[in-house]
């Protein structure tokens, strides 16, 4: 029935598009960003100010709107696969593990994820519920992925990296877009977005979208019962004045259900509202942002919780001669209620209100010629460990088309309710003894990272990007066995990681562009004297040693695109997941200005494969084909 509905919708769009004239200026031409355009891209995530990608003293990758369009991605995790050095693994249904530089777990807790400056990780466990982080993909301007610590400007949880999703201005999305897709395993997105102008200075857009995913199979061939239905709607209103003042308000609401192995369904809902104002005057720029976020999540017999977040942040940038200052302050409040949905898994206390305060300062100094030095720190106070300091020192030297950089940084992951308040009984038990408990004395996990990198643009057709790092981690989470008592969460593990990351982009011909990336990770775990960790560190990391990705974009004609994405992931050691390689492909055709049709094939090399193992019965992901139509008018 869903497939029939999708095909009917595609037919309606086709017949309507043939009768419509596209809005002038609303249609992007088939194109590829040149190498020059790629290295000149402006980014903001590394230092919270605008700088050229080629001038950033950090390891950073940008996923452009063009990359997203040509990938056929329909969700954020699918889009993040395009970042060459990110480890993106599908855990179950709509749930993913996303990490950089190690420590991949299904509840990944060392990455900071932002959508238009709004933090989306859960303070319950410091990870991201990826199934509820959705955007209208065509509204994304770019995704900036910074690898390595970002705590000096972004604060806690920016331990191994920062993912910053930045959407387009409202003025850039005028007109109407209808996006419809149907495939062998997924229906959707079915989405509509409309934008316009209220006055010469005020623009707006609004959207709605739904998607439906069928359940997958376990390795045994049994039904995983992880089907997923999700709907979301949102808006943005933006004012841009000639005096350098920009202000916008945007918000989203969503609701969805996801199947469980038990045959029941988890219920998900929430919404957010964000407002930002910025003013540029001479060499100064001020920004103030506030947002409210509400989430509700019910997993039958396990968890039923409500979380409300309020965040206020202000920053100021000041360029004075050879110095470029950025400083600011912020406040965040979390109100979390564990409403209870079963006696086996709960938090004690049931309710907790958390307050976090922070200030940061960073200064880049132009020392001489192409040599720049940046130093700064974030100072935060949280309710679990008190005062935390996260400093960084970075240096960069640039000459013509070469750039060399290095950095030393410290970052922390502060405790969560999972670490301090968790109580867990045996499944099915109502009065039995606790099996696992949080620790009120749980400390912050921390890392001291040493990084270096090199970038070069070879003529106009090739660019290369190299980075290396050594990370020292202390006070990592363990599960300590205690005879006659519940297992206790504690900080008795340490780690040393080393890695090399390389990437290259080549314009092999005017009509053919190729991106290649490789990440190598070496990791060693050690334990404090007296530790009796039950998992021997397995519960905190299960990483492949090698990740290799290739993207190819071909403009076969002025209307036809042929794109491919190959990825290789090495073996995950414990629990073991065999190495796998896969290929996705897309054939795009511009039927007429304003109307694009794509055929997308995923996982072409194997009928089914496993990407991650979070339980005793891992899921498999099958070969699939989908048809997608995007119509702009």
Regions found by a protein language model. Name each.
Residues 44-61, 77-119, 141:
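Extracytoplasmic beta-strand/coil segments of soluble accessory domains associated
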Residues 366-373, 464-465, 469-472, 490-572:
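Gram-negative outer-membrane beta-barrel transporters
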Residues 151-152, 164, 172-173, 181, ...:
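Periplasmic-side early beta-strands and strand-to-turn transitions of outer-membrane beta-barrels
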Residues 287-299, 334-337, 398-399, 403-405, ...:
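Membrane-embedded beta-barrel scaffold of Gram-negative outer-membrane proteins
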Residues 383-385, 397-450, 468-490, 529, ...:
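Surface-exposed extracellular loop regions of Gram-negative outer-membrane beta-barrel proteins
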Residues 119-147:
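Short acidic/polar hinge/loop motifs at secondary-structure boundaries
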Residues 195-197, 240, 448, 539-633:
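Conserved C-terminal beta-signal and adjacent last beta-strands/turns
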Residues 20-69:
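Short, acidic, small-residue-rich periplasmic hinge/interaction motif at the N-terminus
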